[in-house]
Every structure is written in C-alpha cells, then in structure tokens.
C-alpha cells in the first residue's frame, strides 16, 4: 500500500523528472513539484525518448524511484527501467496497465494497494 500520484496525461521522464530527488520539474505537467519517491505513479501513457528507462534506473540507484507505475498503456520506453532495476539492483517496480474506466476511478484516491495474486488494485480515498 502506497500513496498515489495521479495525472490524467502522458509523462516523459527525460527532462521532466529529477533522478536525484524524484521531483517532477516540468512546470507544464499536472504533477509539477510532486515527489514520486516511494509512491505509486499513475499517468496515462509514456511519452518521450528511450532515456526514460535510464532515468528510472538512476532513480532506483539514488533511492528516489516510484514504488509502482500504473498506465493505460505502457511501452518499452517505461518498461526498460524496471526490468533493468530488477536485474542490477534486485528492486521490483511493478508496472500495471488498466482500463480507462478503472484509471478514472483512481482520480482523487490517496493510496492504492496491489494484489497480484487476485489481479486487483484496492483504492483508498
């Protein structure tokens, strides 16, 4: 169970996230100045360059990575970071894709909890 940061928009990590602090520094993003360290980060879809995976990996190294990521549709740009983090640092960052209907239910939530064995996410408002 972890705090949720939710945005109804895409997100790029390269140039948007400070990998040393986990703070979102793009003043055009809905999560501007929010710190994702140890939180569940929900954004609609990834955008941007292949550097996203490297930023996530650096966040793991500095202890500033999100606890998990929720998307409508992930892609290799995001997935490479958690995959390499598992291999090099033995750190799990779950990446979950959910429906638009379920994604909308996350708006306003304070925390979420994953249950992989039941393929379920509990939402706490």
State what each model feature region is.
Residues 4-116:
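Feature captures the catalytic cores and cofactor-binding loops of soluble hydro-lyases/lyases
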């Amino acid at each position: 169970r972890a705090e949720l940061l939710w945005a109804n928009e895409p997100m790029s990590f390269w140039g948007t996230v400070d990998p040393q602090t986990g703070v979102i520094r793009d003043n055009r993003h809905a999560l501007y100045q929010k710190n994702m360290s140890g939180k569940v980060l929900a954004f609609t879809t990834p955008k941007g360059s292949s550097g996203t995976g490297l930023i996530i990996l650096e966040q793991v190294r500095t202890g500033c990575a999100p606890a998990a990521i929720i998307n409508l549709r992930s892609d290799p740009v995001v997935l490479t970071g958690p995959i390499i983090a598992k291999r090099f640092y033995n750190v799990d960052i779950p990446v979950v894709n959910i429906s638009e209907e379920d994604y909308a239910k996350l708006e306003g939530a304070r925390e979420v909890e994953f249950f992989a064995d039941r393929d379920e996410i509990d939402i706490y408002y």
